[in-house]
């Protein structure tokens, strides 16, 4: 499945570059500064996670998708080749520059792909943000999406903020809708690997209900107890799919991706 999605993504890039040569879209990819904002391996990670959305969440071409923390379109670009004209994509992010690029280069060619700036405070990424995460209401109606996904978002958020976002995710999901999100989950195995020095992150500093790699900049990377995450999903009617898809960050084998992936379905209300 992932190989199919990667080939599809490469075809999209080829068409974009051809359009640029013909006087169409000026860029196939965001500038390097915007790609680095969302992390490395821009194309590869985008293709990887669209594969997970299709394979693990059962995303259909005619469904409505919400990308929380969409950045500069790393997932949106490959999704333009998967969602059809009946499908719909919405994404929001704290980066005005990233959203402006997406609106100019993606929405202009795909009107069913919409992007919004969310001026949410983050001590690292948006220190002048207007809203606190706990006060932010997703700008979408109840039960308006089939799939909601977040990649490398909850890995930078404190437990109360994660809980609020999961409440909002449950609100905007249709009954039977699915959610994919990534974490650094702290459980017996990952904590043992951390203690043995096998983990990519040591999470040596403890905060209220979380661990972090940096005492002064805790949002740089946050690990959450798996028990907490499971409890919050249950609180908001999100049934977790078993087994969880643990990542390689802790030194665990086997693994699926780098971060831990949790898939859940909203139960009928």
Curated annotation (Swiss-Prot):
- Under Enzyme Commission nomenclature, its number is 2.1.1.-
Gene Ontology molecular function terms on file: methyltransferase activity
Keyword Transcription regulation attributed: no
Gene3D superfamilies per the UniProt record, alphabetical: Vaccinia Virus protein VP39
- Chain coiled-coil ranges: none
Biological process (GO) annotations held by this record are: methylation
Domain of life, per UniProt, equals: Bacteria
Provide the alphabetized UniProt keywords: Methyltransferase, Transferase
The UniProt entry's sequence similarity note says: Belongs to the methyltransferase superfamily.
Full protein name = Uncharacterised methyltransferase MT1546
């Amino acid at each position: 499945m992932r190989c199919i999605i990667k080939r599809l993504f490469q075809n999209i890039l080829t068409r974009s570059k051809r359009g640029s040569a013909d006087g169409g879209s000026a860029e196939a990819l965001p500038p390097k500064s915007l790609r680095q904002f969302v992390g490395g391996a821009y194309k590869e990670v985008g293709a990887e996670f669209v594969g997970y959305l299709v394979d693990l969440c059962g995303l259909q071409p005619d469904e409505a998708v919400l990308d929380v923390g969409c950045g500069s379109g790393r997932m949106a670009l490959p999704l333009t080749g998967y969602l059809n004209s009946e499908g719909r994509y919405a994404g929001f992010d704290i980066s005005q520059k990233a959203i402006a690029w997406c609106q100019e280069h993606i929405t202009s060619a795909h009107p069913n792909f919409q992007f919004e700036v969310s001026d949410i405070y983050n001590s690292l990424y948006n220190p002048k943000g207007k809203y606190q995460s706990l006060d932010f209401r997703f700008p979408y109606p109840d039960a308006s999406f089939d799939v909601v996904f977040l990649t490398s978002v909850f890995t930078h958020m404190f437990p109360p903020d994660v809980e609020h976002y999961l409440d909002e995710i449950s609100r905007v999901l249709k009954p039977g809708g699915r959610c994919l999100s990534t974490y650094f989950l702290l459980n017996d195995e990952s904590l043992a690997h951390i203690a043995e020095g096998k983990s990519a992150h040591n999470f040596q500093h403890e905060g209220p209900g979380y661990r972090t790699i940096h005492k002064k900049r805790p949002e740089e990377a946050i690990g959450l107890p798996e028990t907490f995450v499971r409890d919050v999903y249950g609180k908001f009617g999100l049934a977790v799919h078993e087994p969880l898809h643990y990542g390689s960050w802790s030194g665990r084998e086997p693994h699926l991706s780098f971060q831990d992936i949790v898939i859940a379905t909203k139960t009928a209300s």
